[in-house]
Structure formats: C-alpha cells, structure tokens
C-alpha cells in the first residue's frame, strides 16, 4: 500500500485522541487558554456532564478576526517562538482548539478592547467557516457542543454524566487553587455548582473555599528555597489525613501537574507520622527557572521532567519535615469536632452510629518486633519526672524540668495545662486557661522516646557490626558508581561498602540496630533509589522505623497509674518536643476542648 499524506481533519482527530480524552480535558485546555489571555473572571457552563455543552467565558484580552482564524488551525500559537526551553504559559502547542473542533461543534466569539465589534467563527467536525463580525463583550466565549459526535467510538468510553461532571469540577478546583486572583464559576444544567470569588494574594482563603475550613484550620504553611527552586504552599498536620490521595495538589510554575516525583516526595515526608493506608492533604507549588523543567513530556501536560530531580525531591521532603517539626505539637482540630458531635443528644438516636474520626482510629497493625532485647529497660526505668526521655536539647530539657516545679495556677497557663486527673489509667485530663486537654499517655510518651532515639541516630555515627564474611552484591556498573559516590554517607549510618570489581560491591559492616538482615536486598534498594531519585533514604528509613518500634515497646504503658508530678512532667516534655502532636503511627496524642465548647454541651450561652 502506498504512503499518503493524511487529511488535516484526520490529523486533528488523531491529536484529539491524545489531548482531549474526555469533557474535563477540553475544559482544562479552554480554562488554560483563558488564564493565558489574562482573564480575572472565568465562567464554565456545562450540560450532560460536558458532553452536550461546555461553554467557557472569560474577560481576557480577546482576539482579532485574523488571530481567530489562525487559532483554529493546528500548531498556530502566540505563546511559543523558536524554543521549548523557556515556556512561561500554560498552553503552548496550538493543538487544543483544532483538536476540539475536529470532534465537536465548536464556536468562538471574541473581542479585543480596541475593537468596536467582535468576531465569531464556527468549526463543525473539522470543517470551518470564515470569521464573521459579531456582537461581543471584551474577552472570549468558547462553546463546545456534542463532543465526540464526529468520532462515535469515543462516546462508548465516556462515563456517566455525573462522573464526567465531577471530573470537570475537579479541574476547576485545581485551577482555582493555582490562581487565587481569578474568580471561577461553574454551573450545571440548572444551577451553580461551584463558585470561588477571587481572594487576591490570600492563598489560604482560597484553600478554605476549595478544601474547606477544616483544612484552613489544620494547615501548616510551607515556604522554602534551595538552589533557585522555591517551594510554597500548605500541608495538613499529620492527624488531619484521608483515606485517599484525592486532596493532594501539585503545581509547577503555576501549572497543575500529577507528577510521580512530587507525590513520592510528599509520601516520604509524612512516612514517619501517618499510618499506612492514610494520606496527607497538601497543596504544593514549585517555582523555578522554566529552563530547568520540561513540560513537554505528556500530551495533557500533566507530567513534567526536572533537570535535577534530586534537588526537587530533597527540597520537598526537607521543607515539609521542617514545617512538621516546627508545628509538631499541633493535633487536628477536627478531633474536638468529632467529640462534640458524640455528645449531641440527637446523635444517639436509634440507627445512628458514632462518627469515625478523621484520623485512622484503627491504624495499621504494628509490624512484629524484631529487637525486643534492644528496647529492654525502657519500661522498667524510673519515671518520676520522665527526665531520662525525649529532650530534644539541653535548653528545652531544663525548661521542661523547671516547668514541673511551677505552681498549680502557673501550670494551667502552659499550652497543655495542668494535670487534674488520670482516667482508666491511660488518659490524662489537664486544665488549660481556656478549656481542657485529654492526653493519651502511651501515645505521647512513645513519641517522646522516639524523638530521643532519632536524635541519637543523627547526632553521632550509628554503631556498626562487622560481617565475618563480606557479602558480595553484583550490580550494574553504573549502580556501583552511584553507591560508591555515597559510601561515606552510608558509613555514618553503619553500612560499610567497598568496590569489588567493576560490577559488584562488598558489604563489610551493617548497622548493629538491624541485627541479622538481608544486606544484599538493602544495597539493591539503595541502588534503585539512587538511580531514580539521586538520593537514598532506605537505610535511614529502616533505622528510624526500628527506633519507632523500640519506642512503642519502651514507652509508659496503658494501665500504669501516674502521680500528678509525673503527668505534669509528661505534659511539659510534650510542649518541648517536636512532633509531639501525634504518635509514631499518626494517631493524635491529645485532644483539646475549649471552654466555650464545653459550655455549649450544657446549653450555656
């Protein structure tokens, strides 16, 4: 069969198969065009889940009649010159409008501020008409009807109207988070479904609009910079988590992305504080030189490729962990909300059950302890003032000890208050200036012990055990090169490796804390991490996991009766210890109830 040139319509339909997968894809492309045009108000109207109608109206700069005729032609754009190395707009390929026009009934009406009248053009199944004069306001209205009517096979793969409408809503939410200065309105067949007024530079106010007030109340601000890359945004406290990753948003130079590297780094940052199967809520925005990121790696521009992925991964993990440490004594405010609901009289009517807390009350089961002997002695140690545990520094230790000597009235002014009682030999009730705090003594002390052990790991070289017979691990030569480049770092963590020929390394020492272990498996894991991310966290992660296991085993147990001075000492050390708001499994260590909440329970005004 002879080779022939495909028709322009068929070429556009092929492109549409990659660029326009569903109505939400078309909505994304049209909203991006509106934002690139400088719009401050964008209205999206849909019918039939976007399959019957999708209309995007903006107040951007509009187009001239000549530009309008070019806009519907493939690879015609005002956003790109001669290089892909410096892309500063959301769109740049010039594919969206011709792709949509090839599979739908497309009409565009537009006007610039300088023009007395607007212009309109229509494209039906790839066939266009000349631009014609039309009444129009400044800006652009793009109307898409009967999406995929020209490719009926694609319609068979569409989901229900409800599912397609939900996908469009998610696109609008992502765009609204990225552009707080823009007003977004989404309407369905008969009503407005989403409306986000512009919030200017107040990004947290926009987060509250999109993600709810609970996120605003439980968000930690992120702002860090490293080697020209800046990370900003908000991340939820560890105890404010979900059962899925739907509320994790990432942006690169304002572009919404679903990048595996960013999401992997987010998971790694929370690995020590959230139970397995739970997900943090976060909004992360990375700003860097456009020349350092390639946005042209996916038809939908949802993935990007960084020139230095290790830098970005390290920036995300470091910034989030620093923020969690800074705000580590915070627990989710939604815990108190759940407690308030449980006390409401109407809540206990027949057929109703108690609400499930936003954190995982039934966290993932503890993995089997491997080194009981290593943790022996923690539980038996004298705990009169808990002075042997969990002081992150000498200054905070002295402050905690001094705080235990405070008078009863003075103690109530501390953030976690003064201990008043112990319930069921497991929960400490403390009075604060404006309410009360209930502390899980085992979860709290577990965190204090873990922080002490982790500080010890980071403060000096980890003790190592020599292998009687070095273990030889065969690896590709480039993996060996990467491992040896980090050999000094591994030695500080107790893992001593040497080069053994061009395609192998010899393991001579392993961390003593890990006991008998699969040294070859660990080395291969480290090699894989270095190959993918240019950083190796597996060894440090194993050591910290063991420290968490030992801390759980060695903490003051549930069922142990504590004296008042012991309870107050625990409260003061929690205040002085980073990350004390949640235990090592991500559960909260305390819940706070304000006096106003308590008075409402008793009907007081």
From Swiss-Prot:
SUPFAM superfamilies: ATPase domain of HSP90 chaperone/DNA topoisomerase II/histidine kinase, DNA mismatch repair protein MutL, Ribosomal protein S5 domain 2-like
Pfam families: DNA_mis_repair, HATPase_c_3, MutL_C
Recorded GO MF terms: ATP binding; ATP hydrolysis activity; ATP-dependent DNA damage sensor activity; mismatched DNA binding
PROSITE patterns: DNA_MISMATCH_REPAIR_1 (PS00058)
InterPro entries: DNA_mismatch_repair_CS, DNA_mismatch_repair_MutL, DNA_mismatch_S5_2-like, HATPase_C_sf, MutL/Mlh/PMS, MutL/Mlh/Pms-like, MutL_C, MutL_C_dimsub
Keyword annotations: DNA damage, DNA repair
Biological process (GO), any one: mismatch repair
Keyword DNA damage: yes
NCBIfam families: mutl, PRK00095.2-4
UniProt-listed PANTHER family: DNA MISMATCH REPAIR PROTEIN MLH, PMS, MUTL, DNA MISMATCH REPAIR PROTEIN MLH1
Known function: This protein is involved in the repair of mismatches in DNA. It is required for dam-dependent methyl-directed DNA mismatch repair. May act as a 'molecular matchmaker', a protein that promotes the formation of a stable complex between two or more DNA-binding proteins in an ATP-dependent manner without itself being part of a final effector complex.
The protein's name in its UniProt record: DNA mismatch repair protein MutL
Species annotation: Rhizobium meliloti (strain 1021)
């Amino acid at each position: 069969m002879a080779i022939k040139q495909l028709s322009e319509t068929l070429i556009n339909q092929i492109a549409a198969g990659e660029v326009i997968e569903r109505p939400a894809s078309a909505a994304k492309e049209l909203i991006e065009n509106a934002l690139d045009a400088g719009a401050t108000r964008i209205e999206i109207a849909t019918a039939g889940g976007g399959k019957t109608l999708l209309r995007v109206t903006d107040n951007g700069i509009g187009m001239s009649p000549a530009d309008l005729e070019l806009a519907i032609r493939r690879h015609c754009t005002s956003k790109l010159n001669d290089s892909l190395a410096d892309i500063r707009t959301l769109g740049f390929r010039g594919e969206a409008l011709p792709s949509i026009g090839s599979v739908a009934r497309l009409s565009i009406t537009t006007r610039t501020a300088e023009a007395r009248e607007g212009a309109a053009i229509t494209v039906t199944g790839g066939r266009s008409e000349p631009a014609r004069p039309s009444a129009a306001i400044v800006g652009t209205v793009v109307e898409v009807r009967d999406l995929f009517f020209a490719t009926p096979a694609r319609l068979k793969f569409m989901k229900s109207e409800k599912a397609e409408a939900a996908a469009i809503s998610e696109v609008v939410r992502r765009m609204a988070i990225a552009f707080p200065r823009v007003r977004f309105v989404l309407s369905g067949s008969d009503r407005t479904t989403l409306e986000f007024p512009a919030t200017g530079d107040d990004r947290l106010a926009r987060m509250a609009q999109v993600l709810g007030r609970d996120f605003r109340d439980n968000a930690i601000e992120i702002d860090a910079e490293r080697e020209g890359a800046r990370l900003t945004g908000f991340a939820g406290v560890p105890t404010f988590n979900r059962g899925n990753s739907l509320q994790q948003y990432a942006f690169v130079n304002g572009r919404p992305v679903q990048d595996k590297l960013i999401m992997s780094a987010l998971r790694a940052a929370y690995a020590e504080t959230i139970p397995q199967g739970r997900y943090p809520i976060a909004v992360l925005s990375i700003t860097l030189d456009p020349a350092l990121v390639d946005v042209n790696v996916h038809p939908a521009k949802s993935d990007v490729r960084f020139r230095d992925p290790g830098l970005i991964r390290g920036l995300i993990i470091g910034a989030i962990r620093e923020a969690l440490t800074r705000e580590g004594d915070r627990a989710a405010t939604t815990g108190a909300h759940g407690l308030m609901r449980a006390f409401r009289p109407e809540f206990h009517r027949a057929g109703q059950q108690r609400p499930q807390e936003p954190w995982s009350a039934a966290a993932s089961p503890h993995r089997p302890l491997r080194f009981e002997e290593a943790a022996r002695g923690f539980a038996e140690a004298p705990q009169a003032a808990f002075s042997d545990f969990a002081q992150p520094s000498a200054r905070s230790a002295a402050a905690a000890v001094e705080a235990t000597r405070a008078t009863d009235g003075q103690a109530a002014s501390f953030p976690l208050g003064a201990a008043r009682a112990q319930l069921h030999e497991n929960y400490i009730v403390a009075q604060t200036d404006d309410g009360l705090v209930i502390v899980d003594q085992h979860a709290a002390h577990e965190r204090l012990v873990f922080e002490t052990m982790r500080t010890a790991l980071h403060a000096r070289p980890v003790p190592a055990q020599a292998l009687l017979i070095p273990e030889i691990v065969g690896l590709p030569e480039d993996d060996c090169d990467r491992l040896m480049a980090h050999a000094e770092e591994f030695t500080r963590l107790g893992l001593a490796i040497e080069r053994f020929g061009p395609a192998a390394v010899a393991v001579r020492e392993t961390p003593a804390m890990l006991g008998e272990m699969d040294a070859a498996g660990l080395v291969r894991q480290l090699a894989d991490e270095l190959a993918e991310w240019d950083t190796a966290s597996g060894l440090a992660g194993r050591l910290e996991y063991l420290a968490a296991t030992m801390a759980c085993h060695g903490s003051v147990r549930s069922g142990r009766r504590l004296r008042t001075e012991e309870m107050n000492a625990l409260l003061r050390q929690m205040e002085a210890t980073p990350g004390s708001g949640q235990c090592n499994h991500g559960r909260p260590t305390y819940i706070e109830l304000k006096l106003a909440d308590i008075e409402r329970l008793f009907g007081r005004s």
